[in-house]
Regions:
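Beta->alpha turn/N-cap motifs
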Residues: 40-45, 79-84, 93-104, 119, ...
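Ligand-binding cleft/hinge of the Venus flytrap
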Residues: 65-72, 152-176, 206-210
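Acidic, polar ligand-binding/catalytic clefts
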Residues: 66, 70, 75-138, 219-220
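Short loop->beta-strand "edge-of-pocket" segments that line small-molecule binding or catalytic clefts
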Residues: 37-41, 136-154
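A ligand-binding cleft/hinge motif common to bilobed small-molecule-binding domains
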Residues: 84-88, 101-109, 155-159, 186-222
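Extracytoplasmic small-molecule ligand-binding "clamshell" domains
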Residues: 29-100, 176, 240, 251, ...
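Periplasmic-binding protein-like
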Residues: 43, 118-125, 207-246, 261-267
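Short helix-loop capping/hinge motifs at secondary-structure junctions, enriched
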Residues: 30, 128-135, 233-239
Length: 267
């Protein structure tokens, strides 16, 4: 660990007490490329990350990546990668993954996670359709579409086995899609009965559906923290990211981002 980062780790609390202003710190030693903070994300996932009309990557996660890079005195580089391959590229293709990804025990076996927000899923259904599940209990007997690689696949299978079947109800049929938009298209085509999607993204899907889709759930389903994933053992980068989040919370930028993207803060 560089002496500069050791000093940062020791004195970050004092720095925040003295000033709530955002002040950059020296770059962590274990970035893949000196002066560049490389971040993996799947850029099909608004409001977390998506391409705008000028082909720029915009959203919550690019904004967080830029702020962390600024704190490291590095340039952010965003690398578009399939969601199911994101964890595998940490420490090889990029320094971190920031992509609306939940913190789960399975992922933590492969990488270290720093929680940065809290969210859960919403259930999307055809507006006015016969299937309007309010909770996960009402997904029994429903064909549910969702993006491949999400933690909800395991959660739904477990709920189907341990609640639906044990209560004499039909199983949940799970269909995975490469991307969330493909799951939405399947719902519009009536090939599935409902879609499970992270709440902020679900709202955007509904808003863009021209009144054809609606959120049927009445509360968040499977709420979990979202995490910034880095290579196991990269303590320098972990401490630098934690210091960035502490600074952003102290100067109000964190609260503004969380509010802007309809998430919940996490301590």
């Amino acid at each position: 660990m560089t002496s500069t980062l050791k000093k940062i780790s020791r004195h970050v609390a004092l720095t925040l007490a003295v000033s709530a202003c955002f002040s950059p710190v020296t770059q962590a030693a274990e970035l893949l490329t000196e002066g560049v903070f490389k971040v993996g994300m799947e850029v099909t996932y608004p409001p977390f990350e998506s391409y705008d009309s000028n082909n720029n990557i915009v959203g919550l996660d690019p904004e967080f990546a830029a702020l962390i890079a600024q704190h490291l005195q590095a340039k952010p580089q965003l690398i578009d990668t399939k969601f199911t391959s994101l964890i595998l590229g940490i420490g090889k293709k990029y320094d971190a993954v920031i992509s609306g990804m939940y913190v789960t025990p399975e992922r933590q076996k492969q990488a270290d996670a720093i929680p940065y927000a809290l969210s859960g899923a919403s259930i999307i259904a055809l507006k006015g359709g016969a299937v309007q599940p309010k909770t996960e209990d009402e997904l029994c007997g429903v064909k549910v579409g969702l993006q491949a690689g999400t933690t909800w696949v395991t959660s739904l299978k477990k709920h189907s086995d341990e609640w639906c079947l044990k209560n004499g109800k039909p199983a949940i049929t799970i269909q995975e899609f490469p991307t969330a938009p493909e799951a939405s298209q399947a719902l519009l085509s009536k090939n599935i009965g409902a879609q499970l999607e992270i709440a902020p993204a679900a709202q955007i899907i509904v808003d863009k559906s021209r009144g054809r889709l609606g959120i049927s759930s009445t509360r968040l389903v499977y709420p979990l923290p979202l995490g910034i994933y880095i290579a196991k053992g990269n303590t320098e980068l972990a401490e630098a990211i934690k210091a960035t989040l502490a600074t952003l919370k102290a100067n109000g930028q964190y609260a503004a981002l969380i509010k802007k993207y309809n998430l919940e803060s996490i301590d």
